[in-house]
Regions:
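Alpha-helical transmembrane segments
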Residues: 7-23, 64-71, 129-132
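Interfacial loop-to-transmembrane junctions
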Residues: 113-132
Length: 145
């Protein structure tokens, strides 16, 4: 267990930073997505768990967690503007895109492990792209249906 935490200390630190940022943001401005603090924890924690399920090398989960945090940040930013009229459904659109993001993270995690990628920048980028591509594909699928 100690080796797991030591090897993934940057990944865990990125997750903790995003949780702290969203906690402060909700405390200061309120929950503009109207979904509760538990959702922010679940998205960031879920991205970390999905990345670790693929058993990749360290730094992969950090990229996935960063992408999850940025996706939430974009949704919070869009919904906090007074010009947006989302009827409170923007959080549901984010929620429905998470299965695709998880599938993308697991798929690229398996690819990175089988290809034996060793460079940290490549692993970090693969985690980020796995979440991002899966999320975007699911978003496009939601809006085409």
């Amino acid at each position: 267990m100690r080796d797991f935490i030591k090897a993934r200390s940057l990944d865990i630190a990125i997750g903790v930073i995003f949780v702290a940022v969203f906690a402060a943001l909700i405390d200061i401005r309120g929950d503009v997505l109207f979904i509760g603090f538990w959702y922010y924890l679940a998205v960031i924690g879920g991205a970390f768990v999905a990345a670790v399920l693929a058993n990749p090398r360290p730094f992969f989960a950090g990229g996935a967690v960063l992408a999850a945090g940025l996706s939430l940040a974009v949704y919070v930013w869009v919904n906090s503007h007074p010009d947006v009229r989302s009827s409170g459904l923007l959080g549901i659109a984010h929620l429905l895109s998470l299965p695709g993001a998880a599938a993308g993270v697991v798929a690229l995690g398996v690819v990175s492990r089988r290809r034996k990628w060793r460079r940290e920048s490549r692993l970090f980028s693969a985690g980020f792209l796995g979440f991002f591509l899966g999320f975007v594909v699911n978003q496009v699928g939601l809006f085409l249906v």
